[in-house]
């Protein structure tokens, strides 16, 4: 694994959060390309609709833009589900964070960018990085 980045939902959320100092960092990460999962797309749609009050059209446009920048989304499979349960049990993360980590491992990524997980922690060959830690 080398130079393969996976984005947690928070990266996508901040990329569309005008006026937030984290937006520029998130936009730069996404512009470089990387990996996401179907779960990330679904979580983005939920947060964008409920918290950001985006219309369905705006959500669709934002997700289409993300999908042009990223590799095809990793599907949520039974194998990823099982790996996510094992990660949750071993590392104590919530199941949804653990599924993100399992999807990143399945995509053979070496870095997952997330604000919500422990910066610098390694899960197998995967390293968690908080790109906003210095803001």
Residue spans for each PLM region:
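Acidic active-site catalytic centers that drive phospho-/nucleotidyl reactions
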Residues: 8-10, 43, 97, 116
């Amino acid at each position: 694994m080398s130079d393969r980045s996976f984005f947690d939902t928070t990266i996508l959320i901040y990329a569309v959060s005008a006026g937030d100092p984290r937006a520029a960092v998130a936009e730069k990460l996404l512009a470089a390309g990387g990996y996401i999962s179907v779960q990330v797309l679904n979580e983005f749609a939920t947060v964008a609709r409920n918290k950001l009050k985006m219309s369905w059209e705006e959500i669709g446009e934002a997700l289409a833009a993300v999908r042009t920048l990223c590799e095809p989304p990793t599907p949520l499979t039974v194998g990823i589900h099982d790996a996510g349960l094992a990660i949750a049990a071993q590392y104590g993360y919530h199941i949804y964070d653990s599924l993100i980590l399992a999807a990143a491992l399945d995509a053979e990524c070496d870095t997952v960018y997330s604000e919500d997980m422990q910066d610098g922690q390694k899960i197998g060959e995967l390293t968690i990085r908080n790109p906003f830690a210095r803001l």
